[in-house]
Amino acid sequence: MKTDWWKDAVVYQIYPRSFQDSNGDGIGDLRGIISRLDYIKELGADVIWICPIYPSPNVDYGYDVTNHKAIMDSYGTMDDFHELLDQVHQRGLKLVMDFVLNHTSVEHPWFKEAELDKNSKYRSYYYWRPGTKNGPPTDWLSNYGCPVWQYEEHTGEYYLHMNAVKQADLNWENPEVRQAVYDMMKFWLDKGVDGLRIDQLHLISKKEYLPSYEDYINQQAEPKPFQPNGERIHDYLKEITDEVFSHYDVMSVGEVGSVTPEEGLKYTGTDKHELNMIFHFQHMELDQQPGKEHWDLKPLELSDLKSVLTKWQKKLEHQGWNTLFWCNHDQPRIVSRFGDDGEYRKASAKMLAAVIYFMKGTPYIYQGEEIGMTNAPFTRIEDYKDIQTINMYHKRVFEKGYDPNDVMRSILAKSRDHARTPMQWNSGKNAGFTDGTPWLKVNPNFTAINVEEAQGDPDSVLNYYKKLISLRKQYADLMKGSFDLLLPDDPQLFVYMRENSKQQLLSVNNFSKEQAVFQWPKNCGKAQASLLLSNYNNDDLDDEMVFRPYESRVYLLDKTN
């Protein structure tokens, strides 16, 4: 029988390449993950989401797949995977796999046949179009800053790639493609995998006629209208549910980009029979200049963050379900981004956790977030591996003439590699990640910020996360209650109330490095309040309280007294 077990779960995301190496080759692997399962269990997580482990040329580090039914050699064997799955289940945990269905690697056997023969059945598995007198079919740019059309000399046509040149988009209009994808999904679910996170789901339905990029930048057309939420996206999703998910008691989550809450409800509404929940990125785009790329920085306005998160809480309150996250493999470290990774690293990391993880939804904790890992201080482009970062640097510096120092400032703030530096386990060689040479440099602050140090510090970010997760489970019914934002216009405080018929939870958070004054809400019974969680030592409970830099307090109010 299908259940909503995922509503009470806490998910821990692993980027396997950077989590734990077991054989000294500098690359994390499945046996390394097995060796750290007890750590994840002790944290309090219930589900492990593992990024792609399929064979890949690693142009985009696993998101360019050549075989969806195998394990990449550097990660281990299928036997290793079976042992991982068994060990996960023995600990009462669940395993969710990342599944890439918008595109394949150009090294995939389907594409290798398609590029050589226009008459191959695999030709229609991808988007092929003739060029124009000016070159490509359109002048659009991909997510990685290069043209979306790549010329292929064997047949004299262009193929579509919404991401890197080596990631060719699959043609979901072709029912054979869809059935082949469903077969691959069932392959893993039949092994006992507990769910799938679907990568770039919003891109699978595309429009045939693509307007000019020049029209877009001149504000004459919608931004990239052929990319997200095409007209058949929900038809495809209903088919995925009918063909695959409806036959298993598993979790389904899709990455859908920059959708609105109204659009999000179409994906995850309980009456839609599509997905359990979605990853949207509205709240993660608030520190970029409107209409520009995420490299184009601007300060975060707290009022904007409160507004966006509240809209999602309210819109999905009775229909659908939210994902609660700050970090993943594509985002920089949140304590460096929205907090203070210097003097107030611990305080701000804890405050950020209290802000997001007491909301309604399923928490997603990304590896290293729970110990307050920070962005890396790499100032040379040679130290980066991420194709998105490298492409942007070369385009802006060498093609557009940007100041290299300005470009590097953007990279230091936003590169995906900040999330991908090796997990910091201890203060020993390579942070305990590997005995060999790590595939990506370790953040040099590992001597101070690491799991071993955090485990021995009662006041650590790690121990705070453990308490927070425990409280979510202790008050599981309250975590399904209503959400109401308080003080929406306060420039420093992020305050909200969770409530059910018996209890209230008041989360008060100073989102700044300056002191902030909090007035106890008149409609909240202070006499019935007790402090559940805080990131400073305090025991005062007054009508007016001064909150220190990045201070967070979470109160429980009993409505029955």
Swiss-Prot record:
Gene3D superfamilies: Glycosidases, Golgi alpha-mannosidase II, Oligo-1,6-glucosidase, Domain 2
Reaction equations catalysed: Hydrolysis of (1->6)-alpha-D-glucosidic linkages in some oligosaccharides produced from starch and glycogen by alpha-amylase, and in isomaltose
GO molecular function, one term: oligo-1,6-glucosidase activity
Residues marked Transition state stabilizer (site): D330
Active site (catalytic residues): D199, E255
Listed Pfam families: Alpha-amylase (PF00128), SusG_C (PF23915)
Annotated NCBIfam families: PRK10933.1
Protein name: Probable oligo-1,6-glucosidase 2
SMART domains reported in the protein's UniProt record: Aamy
PANTHER family referenced in this protein's UniProt entry, alphabetically: ALPHA-AMYLASE FAMILY MEMBER (PTHR10357), OLIGO-1,6-GLUCOSIDASE 1 (PTHR10357:SF184)
Regions annotated as coiled coil: none
Top-level class of the enzyme under EC nomenclature: hydrolase
